[in-house]
Swiss-Prot record:
The encoding gene: gvpG
Main location: other
Name of this protein: Gas vesicle protein G
GO annotations of cellular component type: gas vesicle
Keyword Hydrolase: no
Length: 83
């Protein structure tokens, strides 16, 4: 009975793990967040963004980057999906 469960359930769980890893990678792309930080800085420097908006966005992006770094550290050694 357990052998049949292993044969039927393990591939499904493995697929879910891969999909979960891919979703986390996509949601927490550190390079994309860094680009957004640079864009925010540039918009502020050329005067298209107020200092208040700049500071708020900067805090949001830095928090997102910190979260992404934490998630990536936790995901080390897990399944690596190559694109």
């Amino acid at each position: 009975m357990f052998l049949v469960d292993d044969l039927l359930v393990n591939p499904f769980l493995s697929l879910l793990d891969i999909l979960h890893t891919m979703a986390l990678d996509e949601m927490n792309d550190m390079e994309e967040i860094r680009d957004e930080i640079k864009e925010n800085q540039l918009l502020y420097e050329i005067g298209e963004r107020s200092e208040t908006d700049y500071q708020q966005r900067k805090q949001q992006l830095e928090a997102r980057l910190e979260t992404a770094e934490r998630i990536q550290a936790q995901m080390q050694g897990r399944i690596e999906v190559k694109r």
